[in-house]
Amino acid sequence: ARRARSCSSRASIGSISSAMRSESALARQVRSPRVVNIADLRERARRRLPGVVFDYIDGAAEDEVTESRNRGAFSEVTFRPRQCVPVPACDLKTTLLGTELALPFLLAPVGNIRSFYPMGDAHAARAAHAAGTAFIQSTFSGMRIEDVRAASAGPLWYQLYVPGGRAVAEATIARARAAGYAALMVTIDTPVAGLRERDIRRGARQILSGQFLTSLPYLWQFVVRPRWVLDFL
């Protein structure tokens, strides 16, 4: 009995030690103790970006009810761990529209990434490639199709709005095809621009007008974020 308890104790200690080593390995992947999860990244973005820029990426239309419900829907998705079952290998690979992916999800298109960081699309494309998935470039990304392709050897898709008519769309599709983009995502959910109340409060329209006197009351948002300003100089 003592031998059995001793073996059991050694096994328990070994399991704990193994779990601690595994946890340490995961912890080592965190580059900064100040940025552990998405909420931490959001807070750092809030502190770095001008208010009008942060509210664009963080906000949504009108009372943001749909955005809130979307977040709630994702929070309902949980993992169901299964115990005492054979797991010879874990494989999340899949193929979507002819693109082989190491993970069953992609980096969705985000417009105006360049306003958050000058080479944002290029970095996002490289990050997607490193994770084994595809990056979808937005029509309003702020970087040329050819430049994003030059920045990443990974799979790329292109998200297309048709604001300039058929001729512009066809020319854009031809460029994406020539650059080796593997798929096309046609977006039809924005026939008109959304009423983004945060943008109105921040003076986005006045700032984008390019008229100094009109935008002057809102320029303080950039003055208090000198690091962001320096990125664009």
Regions flagged by a language model, labelled:
Residues 1-24:
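Low-acidity, Ser/Thr- and Arg-rich intrinsically disordered low-complexity segments
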Residues 22-98, 204-233:
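An N-cap/entry alpha-helix motif that binds or orients negatively charged groups
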Residues 50, 107, 128, 186:
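Conserved, mostly hydrophobic/aromatic
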Residues 105-108, 133-137, 156-160, 184:
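Hydrophobic faces of well-ordered beta-strands that scaffold small-molecule active sites
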Residues 106-118, 158-166:
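Active-site mouth loops of central-metabolism enzymes
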Residues 112, 126, 151, 167-233:
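Alpha/beta enzyme core
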Residues 112-113, 138-145:
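Short glycine-enriched loops at secondary-structure junctions
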Residues 145-153:
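Acidic (Asp/Glu)-rich catalytic clusters
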